[in-house]
Design a protein with these regions (language model features):
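Structured, basic alpha/beta domains of bacterial-type, RNA-associated proteins
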Residues: 2-98
């Protein structure tokens, strides 16, 4: 298994409960693929560097993951489908720092 860091930006119109449920959906995808989510960190509602789909702000999240590449493929596929996610980036890292 490999370590990954994923930053997810959601639409600013989402309520706190909607954002939490969306993050829970994403973490459950990793769990069903026999992966492990080490941490989920909310960076809050922040300004975007430039407009994305007419949005000036977004809810930012950092998720640290330990899983197989096939799990990341499904994880990213689900994020592409979801209209509440306006941008994401997942990178492979050597180790997860605490």
């Amino acid at each position: 298994m490999a370590f990954y860091e994923s930053v997810v930006i959601t639409r600013p119109e989402l309520t706190e409960s909607q954002v939490e449920s969306l993050i829970n959906e994403l973490t459950s995808i990793i769990s069903t693929e026999n992966g492990k989510v080490h941490s989920t960190e909310s960076w809050g509602l922040r300004n975007l560097a430039y407009k994305i789909n007419k949005n000036k702000k977004g809810h930012y999240f950092l998720i640290n993951i330990d899983c197989n590449p096939s799990a990341i493929f499904e994880y990213e596929r689900q994020m592409r489908i979801n209209e509440d996610i306006i941008r994401f980036l997942t990178i492979k890292i050597d180790h997860i720092s605490d």
